[in-house]
């Protein structure tokens, strides 16, 4: 409801009159009462709401993904005319969007599955928008979407046509998977600095403030520096009294499931999903901590040197995560015939969304230089970072393993990097085993 309200206010602020409807009359009245003088026109029946709109009608749905979306569409259909456009701005599973697009197209309606990132504030002030569907339908809503989207530093709006049917929601799903990876990498960096150097929250805030001035400049690093110094009403650091169980809404899981369907090694992002799952086993972990032994963390040596190693490891880990995510976008584009433009996708992530970061421009540049590049690690800029920073990543992972500090995504980054650069892997033995017990055959070198 908050995302829908804020998007309606965003659209209204760009000079449009917006018809609003919610199943709950109270919620509709609440929005109108809270925003006097705004060009928001309330309707209390679907029929009146639909009939209030100019044709071709442009209807933005912001409902909980799943059966609720189907129910909302079914309630609209009796009052729609051919050529009307429904925009689904929810966190919808892309296969559902493909199905709805097919079904509505057959009835003469247009359907645009649209990823919207930026949270409640982004919805109000300008989100990153990822629309997918019929190109001609997109052209009819592009003026509105362009006006409400976030604007990057170079003045470009953070919206672009992504591709047919489920492409927009797929890109949003992968965006969310990358977000999981970013957040887990940052959490592991925090754990290393706390466990390896006993940094205070003030020192952590100072460290992240410095990091945010360089290559790691991003929304997530920026908010993390603020989180470290936030205190509760009792004067305690808030981060220290928050239970160490990270919840999830399932979009990271969808990204990992899709990687398995496509045969894509999305190891870092998948580890970040599993890290949330293991965090939720709090009771088991507390019990296991009293039974299972392991090394006690020793201090990591020179403070400035270790902080720099963790910074480098974090940046290279982030690069590996995005390399995996964009590799998966390529595989999905081939599988679903979407013809995705990866440089444009990186561009619209530069503002408005949760993963917005300075280094996304480097991804756009890499694809501008070589649109067909198989993996971002092969692009000159990212190859140089890997050359220069891999020792720091290896040192940090080795330190963590020796000192019993779990770093699943840092470890996944090293494993993926070494596997990807290996001309020969021991998979020949696995294939021999498969042939031995199951006559699966094999190829000769």
Swiss-Prot record:
Residue positions binding substrate: 91, 117-119, 175-176, 180, 249, 276, 434, 440
The keyword Metal-binding appears for this protein: no
Catalytic activity: 6-phospho-D-gluconate + NADP(+) = D-ribulose 5-phosphate + CO2 + NADPH
Entry EC no(s): 1.1.1.44
Pathway recorded for this protein: Carbohydrate degradation; pentose phosphate pathway; D-ribulose 5-phosphate from D-glucose 6-phosphate (oxidative stage): step 3/3
Residues that hold NADP(+) according to the record: 1-4, 22-24, 63-65, 91
InterPro entries the UniProt entry points to: 6-PGluconate_DH-like_C_sf, 6PGD_dom2, 6PGDH_C, 6PGDH_Gnd/GntZ, 6PGDH_NADP-bd, 6PGdom_BS, NAD(P)-bd_dom_sf, Pgluconate_DH
Residue pairs linked by disulfide bridges in the UniProt entry: none
Record keywords: Gluconate utilization, NADP, Oxidoreductase, Pentose shunt
Pfam families for this protein: 6PGD, NAD_binding_2
Active site: 172 (proton acceptor), 179 (proton donor)
Gene3D superfamilies reported for this sequence: 6-Phosphogluconate Dehydrogenase, domain 3, N-(1-d-carboxylethyl)-l-norvaline Dehydrogenase, domain 2, NAD(P)-binding Rossmann-like Domain
A Gene Ontology BP annotation from the UniProt entry: D-gluconate metabolic process
Consequence of changing residue 206 to D: In strain: CT42
GO molecular function: NADP binding; phosphogluconate dehydrogenase (decarboxylating) activity
Family of the protein in this entry: Belongs to the 6-phosphogluconate dehydrogenase family.
Quaternary context: Homodimer.
Chain's role: Catalyzes the oxidative decarboxylation of 6-phosphogluconate to ribulose 5-phosphate and CO(2), with concomitant reduction of NADP to NADPH.
Name of this chain's protein: 6-phosphogluconate dehydrogenase, decarboxylating
Naturally occurring in which organism (per UniProt): Citrobacter koseri
């Amino acid at each position: 409801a908050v995302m829908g309200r804020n998007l309606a206010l965003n659209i209204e602020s760009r000079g449009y009159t917006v018809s609003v409807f919610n199943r709950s009359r109270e919620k509709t009245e609440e929005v109108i009462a809270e925003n006097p003088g705004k060009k928001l026109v309330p309707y209390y029946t679907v029929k009146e709401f639909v009939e209030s709109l100019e044709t071709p009608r442009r209807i933005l749905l912001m409902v909980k993904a799943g059966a609720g979306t189907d129910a909302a569409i079914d309630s609209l259909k009796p009052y729609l005319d051919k050529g009307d456009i429904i925009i689904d701005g929810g966190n919808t599973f892309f296969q559902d969007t493909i199905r709805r697009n097919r079904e509505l197209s057959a009835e003469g309606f247009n359907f645009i599955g649209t990823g919207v990132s930026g949270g409640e504030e982004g919805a109000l002030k300008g989100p990153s928008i990822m629309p997918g569907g019929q190109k001609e339908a997109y052209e009819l809503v592009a003026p509105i979407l362009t006006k409400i989207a976030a604007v990057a530093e170079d003045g470009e709006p953070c919206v672009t046509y992504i591709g047919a049917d489920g492409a927009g929601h797929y890109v949003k799903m992968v965006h969310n998977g990358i977000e999981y990876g970013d957040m887990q990498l940052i959490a592991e960096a925090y754990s290393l600095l706390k466990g390896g150097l006993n940094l205070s929250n003030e020192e952590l805030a100072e460290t992240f403030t410095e990091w945010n001035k360089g290559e790691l400049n991003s929304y997530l690093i920026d908010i993390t520096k603020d989180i470290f110094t936030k205190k509760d009403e009792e004067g305690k650091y808030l981060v220290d009294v928050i239970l160490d169980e990270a919840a999830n809404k399932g979009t990271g899981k969808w990204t990992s499931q899709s990687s398995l369907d496509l045969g894509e090694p999305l190891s870092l992002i998948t580890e970040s999903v599993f890290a949330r799952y293991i965090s939720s086993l709090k009771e088991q972990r507390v019990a296991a901590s009293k039974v299972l032994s392991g090394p006690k963390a020793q201090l990591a040596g020179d403070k400035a040197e270790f902080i720099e190693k963790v910074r480098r490891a974090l940046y290279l880990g982030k690069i590996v995560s995005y390399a995996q995510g964009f590799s998966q976008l390529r595989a999905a584009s081939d599988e679903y015939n979407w013809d995705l433009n990866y440089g444009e996708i990186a561009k619209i992530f530069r503002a408005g969304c949760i993963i917005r970061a300075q280094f996304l421009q480097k991804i756009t540049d890499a694809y501008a230089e070589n649109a067909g590049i198989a993996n971002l690690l092969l692009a000159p800029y990212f190859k140089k970072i890997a050359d220069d920073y891999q020792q720091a990543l290896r040192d940090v992972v080795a330190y963590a393993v020796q000192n019993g500090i779990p770093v699943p995504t840092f470890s996944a980054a090293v494993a993926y990097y070494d596997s990807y650069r290996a001309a020969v892997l021991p998979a020949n033995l696995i294939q021999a085993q498969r042939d031995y017990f199951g006559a699966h055959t094999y190829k000769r070198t």
